[in-house]
A protein has these predicted regions:
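Aromatic-rich, lipid-facing transmembrane alpha helices and their immediate juxtamembrane interface loops
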Residues: 1-160
């Protein structure tokens, strides 16, 4: 699975013409979000709002952390491109779409694969999942921007 996401990262990096600094920023963004994901999973599990069928062993959590880094990095290369093209308005749209479609995706996955994930009934678990997707975009993009710099400062800005 990590190999597939690594290939996806390479393809997105090529298609977005990402520099080494941007790729590094995307990986740092993924690393920050990996910690957020692990913390949120633990909190949702403790509240009884969500159960993910994972083993809470350190080795498995380390693998999940590495997977989330490689899985999120292409997303931040894309959000960087959106910010470059559409500015903060484009990022707000991406965040809103993620906040709506993220819970839809997770509810679909819970209905289709109940052995992998179960979500408690009610509004608050869905709101928490939406907030998690929003936090993933905001935290990851902010971390990437701290490493790679603002998208408007890109030397390829006018070369689309």
């Amino acid at each position: 699975m990590v190999g597939g996401y690594t290939v996806a990262l390479a393809v997105v990096a090529y298609l977005t013409r990402a520099t080494g600094r941007r790729i590094g920023g995307a990986v740092v963004g993924g690393a920050c979000v990996g910690l957020v994901v692990l913390a949120v999973l633990w909190v949702l599990e403790a509240l009884g709002w969500c159960h993910v069928g994972i083993t809470w062993a350190p080795a498995f959590l380390s693998l999940l952390y590495v997977l989330s880094i490689v899985w999120c990095a292409p997303l931040y290369l894309l959000t960087w491109r959106v910010a470059r093209r559409f500015g903060w308005v484009g990022l707000v749209v991406v965040v809103c779409v993620a906040g709506v479609l993220g819970p839809v995706h997770d509810l679909w996955a819970a209905a289709r694969f109940p052995q992998w994930i179960t979500i408690a009934p009610g509004l608050w678990p869905v709101v928490a999942i939406g907030a998690t997707y929003i936090a993933e975009i905001v935290v990851g993009h902010a971390a990437m921007r701290m490493v790679a710099g603002a998208s408007r400062a890109d030397p390829l800005r006018g070369a689309s």
